[in-house]
Amino acid sequence: MSDISRRTFVGTTVGTTVGTAIGTALAPATLAAADYRIIDPHVHVWKHDPEFPFAQGQKVPARDATPETLLGLMKSNGVSKTVLIQVIHYRYDNRFLAHTLKQYPKTFKGVCRVDPLDPAAPDHLSQLTEQGFRGVRLSPGSGPVGDWITGPLMPPLWKRCSELKVPMTILAPVVRMPEIAQLMEKLPEMTLVIDHMADCPVDQPQELEKLIALKRFPNVFVKISHTWSLSHQPYPWLDSQELVKRLHATFGPQRLMWATDWPIIESVAKYSQALTVVRDDMKFLNADDKSWMLSKTIERVWPFPA
């Protein structure tokens, strides 16, 4: 497999919870407190449907994670809009996500996947952008199987992404950040979003400096998601909050964004907790910080209509 495959566990860990999470709601008074709309920049959806088959060789998820289930969660938790990320179950077949975007054009935006080992990937990205996608995701793993990130096919793909003015999103371990920086040196104004704090281990905090080094590029953003998966503690995951605190001190709230990573989160925590940990339990954030990290930063990258 050419890219990171950690999400293949979804079929077994999420299957028992996807159908029940919709009941998790927040207090109405809390929902009314914010004067901005909350936007979730990282969610996956899929459905067992012969019209949109899962990719060969991928582990088939036990249950669906449908847009309709997601819409219920969003309503219950006061989330207005969501950015949908192409899930690994379909690999580079983006048709189900394209179908979903056509169904709910005012609520969702989509980030596609292209095959990083295909020389035609830049043209595929152009075609997908014409279809309405607003970004592409690459996921190089930490071992030799992910070394394509340093190969000759990357500069043309990154250049096309920059020309199309759509964000590149990167799922990669923190050890890959220096290689990401080398690609950014050639396109320093390009919009790049690093997923999940580069999954920096909480017991190796010095490794976060590899991610912090990307601060010098003005359009690099970081999702502070995965506090729940990186932590060795129960909610509110104070050990992984320390990573967020350092990123907040260096990047500032204008370049950080929260995310649920639903339904992956349901193997460990609740959809609502991905929101409340930022909104209620990161005590080092003030109200203005939260307005950026829950809303305005995301709109810098993925602007939604009013």
Predicted features and spans:
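Mid-to-C-terminal alpha-helical segments outside catalytic/metal-binding sites
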Residues: S2-L26, Y36-P41, V60-K81, K245-R246, ...
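Cleavable N-terminal signal peptides
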Residues: T30-L31
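Mid-domain alpha/beta scaffold segments of enzyme catalytic cores
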Residues: D35-L164, V202, L238
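Active-site metal-binding loops of divalent metal-dependent hydrolases
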Residues: V43, M197, D261-W262
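N-terminal cationic-hydrophobic initiation segments that often serve targeting/anchoring roles
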Residues: M74, L101, P105, M184-E185, ...
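Short beta-strand segments
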Residues: L84-Q86, R113, K223-H226, M257-A259, ...
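Hydrophobic packing residues within well-ordered alpha-helices of enzyme cores
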Residues: L97, I180-L183, V278
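Catalytic pocket-lining loop regions of alpha/beta-barrel enzymes
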Residues: W148-M257
